[in-house]
Design a protein with these regions (language model features):
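Basic, low-complexity intrinsically disordered segments
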Residues: 1-306
Length: 306
């Protein structure tokens, strides 16, 4: 009998929190999602406590079922057992170390709940905040396995909160939407696909990129050369030369992009900007070519057509 009284006390607190959510949502449309997240955190905590703690909560949902039956009748039909389980899972996710959780909406968190890796969750939370991602944008990034396409070194840096370089943020492979009926494409076709979705391409490279131009003309002696794509990164304060290759990376590709980088450094960059970065987007990487390249500011990443 005593246990039942305690459970009902928790139930009344949970009910009041959820009623607050429903009332608030009718008058504070602009901020209701964040308010909902905060209230659901409180509800999740009370559910765990009512079940006797996290360990005991793993072995049964009888109490949640009882709560759900009453809440559906007394508050709103959306508070069924599935929703209450999500709310409980949300609380546990925060307890495991999800950061800055109060800055996202409940709609965002519903997409993150199926993820078990807390480092992956924090990665997506951070990019949602930094890039002001919609729920649709977040779903797309999760679907494209953006976190999985980071290097292990970058994942370790993120987990230990070390400083991240521009090159750490580059995904491998870069995902590019293909409008053609074939996966065998020319460099011209590859460039067209990228320019059709330049914002998506820059997001694949990381944060802070701005588009300057394509076929950027430079003059080497009496001969004109053309940089495939020239970008600028405002976060890292440097120009970024992008060269596209539909073959495996070759040593001459390194030499070519280094010439372009040196030109930008000498003729375009100011003394207040950092040295130019070079990114080669190739069909296949060659780790030995990169390994023995003398320039640490050159990186190669592969592309994948989807």
């Amino acid at each position: 009998m005593k246990g039942l009284i305690i459970d009902m006390n928790y139930y009344e607190e949970i009910k009041n929190e959820l009623i607050d959510v429903e009332v608030y949502n009718t008058v504070k449309e602009y901020s209701k999602n964040r308010y909902t997240s905060e209230k659901y955190y409180n509800v999740g905590k009370m559910i765990i406590e009512a079940q006797g703690g996290e360990e005991r909560a793993k072995y049964g949902d009888g109490l949640i079922k009882e709560y759900a039956v009453k809440l559906v009748k007394e508050v709103d039909k959306k508070y069924d057992i599935t929703t209450l389980k999500r709310i409980r899972q949300f609380y546990l996710m925060i307890q495991k170390g999800a950061t800055m959780w109060h800055q996202l909406s409940w709609s965002h968190y519903r997409e993150l709940l199926p993820i078990n890796n807390i480092n992956m969750i924090n990665y997506y939370i951070n990019i949602c905040i930094n890039q002001s991602l919609s729920v649709r944008d977040l779903k797309e990034k999760i679907k494209n396995k953006e976190y999985d396409r980071l290097t292990n070194e970058t994942k370790l840096k993120l987990a230990t909160k070390e400083d991240i370089t521009l090159m750490d943020n580059i995904k491998n492979p870069i995902v590019i939407k293909n409008k053609y009926d074939t996966n065998i494409i020319s460099e011209k076709m590859l460039k067209e696909l990228i320019l059709d979705n330049i914002e998506t391409f820059m997001n694949e490279l990381g944060e802070g990129f701005c588009y300057i131009g394509n076929e950027y003309k430079i003059k080497l002696g009496v001969v004109y050369n053309y940089i495939d794509i020239l970008l600028y990164n405002i976060k890292y304060n440097c120009y970024v030369v992008v060269e596209l290759k539909v073959t495996e990376l070759k040593k001459e590709h390194i030499g070519q992009i280094q010439v372009y980088m040196n030109y930008i450094d000498e003729n375009v960059k100011t003394i207040y900007q950092d040295k130019t970065i070079g990114i080669i987007v190739a069909k296949h990487n060659n780790k030995y070519v990169i390994r023995y390249s003398s320039n640490p500011k050159v990186v190669c990443t592969e592309f994948e057509l989807v």
